[in-house]
């Protein structure tokens, strides 16, 4: 009976373990990022997506994204890029950032689960995804400066 209970407990643990990552990002993986806008400096805690595998998954399958957190996709060099919202359940603001840390373009309030491509509108080094409404609420706009170690203009 004891062995049976241990097996059931182990199986249950494996089932609920992935749920812990469905919401907020793991604090051990978060890095600070700042955006200086006309309304002030805004600090975010971001998870890095630097490998092709991390970038392909992105924020897919997550059911929530807390305010002040996000995911930073680092392409390691400037390039035009496009994103979609396939398997992404929360609406996002996508912030397209040049290598010098300047915001090139923002796609606000993207539609969850949409397979419509959202273009960077030019070459970018990175894309920051945050919860929809963040840019409007904080007054973040194209031309604002992002500070993080991956950007040359830090």
PLM ranges: what are they?
Residues 7-20:
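Bacterial N-terminal signal peptides
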Residues 1-4:
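Positively charged n-region of N-terminal signal peptides that target proteins for export
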Residues 23-154:
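Compact, glycine-rich, soluble single-domain proteins
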């Amino acid at each position: 009976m004891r062995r049976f209970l241990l097996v059931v407990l182990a199986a249950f643990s494996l089932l609920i373990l992935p749920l812990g990552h469905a919401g907020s990002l793991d604090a051990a993986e978060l890095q600070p990022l700042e955006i200086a806008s006309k309304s002030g400096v805004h600090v975010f805690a971001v998870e890095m997506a630097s490998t092709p595998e991390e970038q392909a998954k992105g924020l897919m399958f997550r059911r929530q994204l807390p305010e002040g957190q996000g995911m930073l996709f680092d392409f390691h060099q400037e390039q035009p890029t496009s994103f979609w919202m396939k398997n992404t359940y929360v609406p996002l603001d996508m912030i397209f950032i040049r290598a010098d840390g300047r915001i090139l373009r923002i796609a606000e309030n993207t539609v969850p689960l949409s397979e419509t491509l959202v273009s960077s509108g030019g070459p970018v080094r990175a894309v920051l995804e945050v919860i929809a409404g963040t840019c409007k609420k904080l007054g973040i706009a194209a031309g604002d400066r992002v500070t993080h170690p991956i950007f040359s203009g830090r």
